[in-house]
Regions:
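Conserved beta-strand-loop surface patch within small alpha/beta domains used
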Residues: 1-84, 92-161
């Protein structure tokens, strides 16, 4: 089970609702003092504007982390002794599923044979319809299946109750 603190889940939901109708993205870290949500910049609109042939989708149906920002946030997390729990993004007006594009980006070099780009890190997809969170699902790499599969999540308090 992937542990997500209630306050962290609420922060990610709020980000998804505030960003609607565009996809949002971010990182959930585990720190010694609890989980930390870091909102990230979705650069998909800029990519689409710069080259609509190469990037036909805009931020309403796609997301892309700002690579420099992601590198800096993960560096800061490493320095603080934090661990990445998961990456999250939203699906405005769509269900909570892990798309082929999501899978490709989560794989090292986009190749199944190379495995996940971030071993041990899960992915949360938040479905938002008309500024209301309808569903959310987590996905993690399954070595036997050689694929990302839906994985249950819950709060740490619920697991210890």
């Amino acid at each position: 089970m992937i542990e997500i603190e209630t306050s962290a889940l609420g922060a990610m939901h709020a980000h998804a609702v505030e960003g609607f109708p565009e996809e949002v993205c971010g990182v959930l870290f585990a720190s010694p003092n609890g989980q930390v949500v870091r909102r990230m910049t979705n650069v998909q609109n800029a990519l689409h504007a710069a080259d609509p042939t190469e990037n036909p989708r805009d931020a309403r149906t796609a997301y892309q982390f700002d690579g420099a920002e992601l590198l800096e946030v993960t560096r800061q997390g490493d320095e603080a002794g934090w661990r990445i729990v998961l990456f999250y993004h939203s699906h405005p007006q769509h269900g909570a599923y892990f798309s082929d594009t999501d899978k490709s980006r989560a794989l090292f070099g986009g190749e199944v044979d190379l495995g996940p780009a971030f071993p041990g890190v899960a992915y949360l997809v938040i479905s938002v319809y008309d500024r209301v969170v309808r569903d959310r699902k987590t996905f993690a790499w399954n070595e036997a299946a050689q694929d990302f599969v839906e994985t249950p999540f819950g709060s740490p308090a619920a697991r210890h109750a």
